[in-house]
Amino acid sequence: MNNQWRFTGNELKYVTDVIASGEGSSTSGNYNSLFEKEFAKKCGAKYAVTFNSGTSTLHAALHALGVGYGDEVIIPPVTVISNFDVTVAANAIPVFADVDPETFNICPKE
């Protein structure tokens, strides 16, 4: 059984560069900026923004949508806690919707 890493490109060089630079944050450094530019280009967008976590991304999404005090955000009860947390942090009201037992996705009929 061979459990060695399999690199198909410049992955090892890039990781080594990041470690050597001392800028190991997931949202700083040259590689992060390069990724944002290339991702935006691939998506046909002017800009792209990366985040350090899914929770940070959800916070930003609710803020960008203008979700705030008294707004209702529909979320499934079978989910990660951050969906609930960011809704409450935005002073919005989490509303749990039933899920389809086959897919665990929100059931549109409910």
Regions found by a protein language model. Name each.
Residues 63, 67-110:
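PLP-dependent aminotransferase-like
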